[in-house]
Amino acid sequence: MGWLPLLLLLIWFSGAPGQRSPLNDFQVLRGTELQHLLHSVGPGPWQEDVANAEECAGLCGPLLDCRAFHYNLSSHGCQLLPWTQHSPHTRLQRSGRCDLFQKKNYVRTCIVDNGVEYRGTVAITVGGLPCQRWSHRFPNDHKFTPTLRNGLEENFCRNPDRDPGGPWCYTTDPAVRFQSCGIKSCREATCLWCNGEDYRGSVDSTESGRECQRWDLQHPHPHPFEPGFWTKIWTTTIAGIRTARSGPGAIPPTRRWRESSATYPAAVQRSEAQPSQEATTLNCFRGKGEGYRGTVNTTAAGVPCQRWDAQLPHQHRFAPEKYACKDLRENFCRNPDGSEAPWCFTSRPGMRMAFCYQIRRCTDDVRPEDCYHGAGELYRGSVSKTRKGIRCQNWSAETPHKPQFKHTSAPHTPLEENFCRNPDGDSHGPWCYTTDPGTPFDYCALRRCDDDQQPSILETAHQVLFDKCGKRVTRVDPLHSKLRVVGGQPGNSPWTVSLRNRQGQHFCGGSLVKEQWVLTARQCFSSCHMSLVGYEVWLGTLFQDPQPGEPDLQHIPMAKMVCGPSGSQLVLLKLERPVILNQRVALICLPPERYVVPPGTRCEIAGWGETKGTGDDTVLNIALLSVISNQECNVKHRGRVRESEMCTAGLLAPVGACEGDYGGPLACFTHDCWVLQGIIIPNRVCARPRWPAVFMRVSVFVDWIHKVMRLG
């Protein structure tokens, strides 16, 4: 073979499309359904047993009358849709069962190349003139006939003649026949700042023109980045390129994955000015903590952090001079790459990195607009929005939530308009039904008045009786257990559940308090409104990585998340369906309201988290701890422990909860039943010898738990 045919063959291969996925033409909204409000118009039927979303995209892609589809991750169902979110009479709604995929050309607000494939809904020219409908010949006659293929719908801007200036339209002004619509190129519509970690634009090709691989696919290039978990701009392309993690770009596949500078950057315009960023914080972190600028310099396990300007014991790419916008000073915890929380490389050679979960989360509540006394039962103000800023539903309304409290059912509390009230004496203050279909009720943008003295709950414990909860076949004998979670031993805790992300990886613990409800820690989730599609609860196994076919294993999708009252650090998870109770899966009892566990009570913690080398973290570990009073606990913690928290004694040996255990139970044995008295939350240092551990006190929030489960 001569050199010319060989050269042509190489050129042909270099321009080959590669393993292109049909999903590349779609944009996804996780945990979302698209509803059409007109009953006369219906979607396509559900097609079951579709292998995955790619197969569904392959069905929808070639069809001119298919513009989107729903994909049910649990049932592998696929439903084709003839409309998008920009179509008239449609509404997006949060969903716990499916994702919405829409063709990019129909939902982009910018154009690719000259915009021939643009199918958006802009209908006004750059000069502000309304567009003429393509089906009309007046005031400007033309030769174009609308079809499904050319997309000449209504009076939307289009580019049927491939004009280099982009989409245009005939105008309704007889004096101006046609005009450009001035729709920006996707390369210019959104620019990037710093290293592009906050970029959320629509560019899906590299600077050299190669198309990017989808983040939710693992082919042709496998990668560790989970959509919604790692929200990055890094471009993984399909044309023989791997990703590079220093700004948007990619590196050739002949080089192994490594942290290096980009050689094929994404086609995005860089900005010299910093965009409006989330405010920096010093003592807490918001979201994923990218704006945290405090001075914590140890991990949640108490391991000192490695300096960012050092390459020992761990080599890395985060040189402070390359990431000046990330404030990588000394060895302070930071989040330069958009992980789920601030983190650092550790000073231990055997532990590369760890999260700094001991840094508390900032509250995301809106500013209170008024105050109340006591529990707010006598509050008669006019505040009508929740602590998250959601408008309250009128008490007389039947939608979106059917109220249990009306004028007739609460004669002593005037339920006027949509004002915040407390008709049921909720101990956490005035509340309301909300106008958000996914949030039945929430507490209001109110605070306790400064001159109001909250009654103490630290009083004598009263009698507790339980029936069918908190039972297990075998339990650790508190008298004969050997303290070896850190310092724990393998054991059975049938109400302890494992929370799993989309990849099936354990990330937190939880407690089964009802057949369809799990209580866990707020620290386990980046937001109270994040999509739970693909997230599951695993029950009925002692193993962090159970074998396929394990008979008692149950894995149930999470359907809904409800964040607890302000300051609670709690989250209730509603499951897609009830669990099946058996010897391996049992409910744990909830304590009476405001119950205080007597000092000296023996309790246990359970989890699959970090053991710091003291045990087997592949199985469920249990450790025994003894409750101490808040007064004794505050001697060590310098008065920082609140009444809504409780403590266990520090032991000589390192015994306690660490990363991966958060959200799990502190269960105390009372009257022959195990009772959920505390929830594991990050402490300043986990399992520190002679140092009391702090837990959220469940009894303070048990009325909220019952209320959420009752209202669904």
Swiss-Prot record:
Extract the GO molecular function terms from the UniProt entry: receptor tyrosine kinase binding
Q: Does the keyword Lipid biosynthesis apply?
A: no
**Peptidase S1 domain: which residues?**
485-710
Family that this chain belongs to: Belongs to the peptidase S1 family. Plasminogen subfamily.
Which compartments does it reside in? Secreted
GO process terms (BP): negative regulation of gluconeogenesis; proteolysis; regulation of cAMP-dependent protein kinase activity; regulation of receptor signaling pathway via JAK-STAT
Quaternary structure and interacting proteins, as annotated: Dimer of an alpha chain and a beta chain linked by a disulfide bond. Interacts (via beta chain) with MST1R (via SEMA domain).
Q: What gene is this protein a product of?
A: MST1
Q: Which UniProt keywords apply?
A: Disulfide bond, Glycoprotein, Kringle, Repeat, Secreted, Serine protease homolog, Signal
**One CC-aspect GO term:** extracellular space
Highest taxon of source: Eukaryota
List the InterPro entries hit by this protein, alphabetically. HGF/MST1 (IPR024174), Kringle (IPR000001), Kringle-like (IPR013806), Kringle_CS (IPR018056), Kringle_sf (IPR038178), Pan_app (IPR003609), Peptidase_S1_PA (IPR009003), Peptidase_S1_PA_chymotrypsin (IPR043504)
PAN domain location is: 21-105
Matching entries from SUPFAM superfamilies are given as: Hairpin loop containing domain-like, Kringle-like, Trypsin-like serine proteases
For this entry, the protein name equals: Hepatocyte growth factor-like protein
Where do the Kringle domain residues begin and end? 109-186, 190-268, 283-362, 370-449
* Classification via Gene3D superfamilies: Hepatocyte Growth Factor, Plasminogen Kringle 4, Trypsin-like serine proteases
Share the record's PTM remark: Cleaved after Arg-484, probably by HPN/Hepsin, to yield the active form consisting of two disulfide-linked chains.
Q: Which Pfam families match?
A: Kringle, PAN_1, Trypsin
Q: Which residues are glycosylated?
A: N72, N297, N394
> Major location, coarse class?
secreted
